[in-house]
Amino acid sequence: MLFLAPGYIFPNVATPVTVAIDFAQAVKQGAYNVLDLKASPIPNPELFQPPSRIIRGPLNYLLSLPGKDIRGKLIDALNEWFRVPEDKLNIIKEIVVILHTASLLIDDIQDSSELRRGNPVAHRIFGVAQTINSANYAYFLAQAKLADLNDSRAFDIFTKGLLKLHRGQGMELYWRDNLICPTEEEYVEMVSCKTGGLFYLAVQLMQLNSEVTVNFSNFINLLGIIFQIRDDYMNLQSGTMTKTKGFSEDLTEGKFGYPIIHSIHAAPNDSQLIQILKLKTKDEVIKQYAVRYIESTGSFVYCREKLDMYLEEANETFRGLEMLLGPSKGIRAILDFLRTR
């Protein structure tokens, strides 16, 4: 039987068999004492570095696909106020983009998605197991970068942020898998965790490196809610979304998006929409019917009205922040972008 020492890293070689042979030869030749746990497990450890290129494959693939980068733009815009030094800002941006990309890798598996940004999802290319591993690796890769911020509080912020993100994701999956339509209030709470949580994690890391101590939680929470409701609306109404993710993908996923939630509650005695979600269908005829049904319950109109309401609240909060901190063209541009549909 072959024993591997604690801390042994599989080398960048073709097969596990090669690993076993090389390691066994090292032991046989006396280059490694199996009883000495402090010894190097191989005679030339520099030849056996972690195969990070392979491990990062799904992550790097998704990073290479162009996206909206709304989080990076938000960080740059907020920095008009925070004035975080460039080196620290770049670290924070890298942490956030890695976390966001890792969450997308997992989301696409959990949702059985086929397209991401108009291209095949990572797990269709690399496989489910390798993609999950790459996403998990990315979470810890982001965590390791916290050390470069030189502030012990960053780890607590990071941990709480990821716990919040996974709580939100867990509730959304629970509703979907058990065909439980949440209330509007439950949806907003979920979004505050899932979408707003990563936004706020970025803000908190920035404030560790800034003299600005103003509480941004309400404003960032509003941005997260607006972003997610808009995304749910666009999923069912936007031609652009059809090209990048597929036609009305939320229906195929069985997801309780904002317009769908309103439509179900608007006609509580009609189970048609619930039954369509249960099918998780790819049939465009059925999905087109579902979109017409959602339209018939006034849910798209309601969605636009709620977006306008949240946007007005966000703009009012933004004006208050400008009075305290000065103007921000970047934040104004983001709010204008979120108004477009």
Curated annotation (Swiss-Prot):
Family: Belongs to the FPP/GGPP synthase family.
Alphabetized GO MF terms: (2E,6E)-farnesyl diphosphate synthase activity; dimethylallyltranstransferase activity; geranylgeranyl diphosphate synthase activity; metal ion binding
Gene expressing this chain: penG
Organism: Penicillium crustosum (Blue mold fungus)
Name this polypeptide is given: Geranylgeranyl pyrophosphate synthase penG
Reaction equation(s) it catalyzes: isopentenyl diphosphate + dimethylallyl diphosphate = (2E)-geranyl diphosphate + diphosphate; isopentenyl diphosphate + (2E)-geranyl diphosphate = (2E,6E)-farnesyl diphosphate + diphosphate; isopentenyl diphosphate + (2E,6E)-farnesyl diphosphate = (2E,6E,10E)-geranylgeranyl diphosphate + diphosphate
Binding site for Mg(2+) 2: 107, 111
Cofactor requirement: Mg(2+)
Protein purpose: Geranylgeranyl pyrophosphate synthase; part of the gene cluster that mediates the biosynthesis of the indole diterpenes penitrems. The geranylgeranyl diphosphate (GGPP) synthase penG catalyzes the first step in penitrem biosynthesis via conversion of farnesyl pyrophosphate and isopentyl pyrophosphate into geranylgeranyl pyrophosphate (GGPP). Condensation of indole-3-glycerol phosphate with GGPP by the prenyl transferase penC then forms 3-geranylgeranylindole (3-GGI).
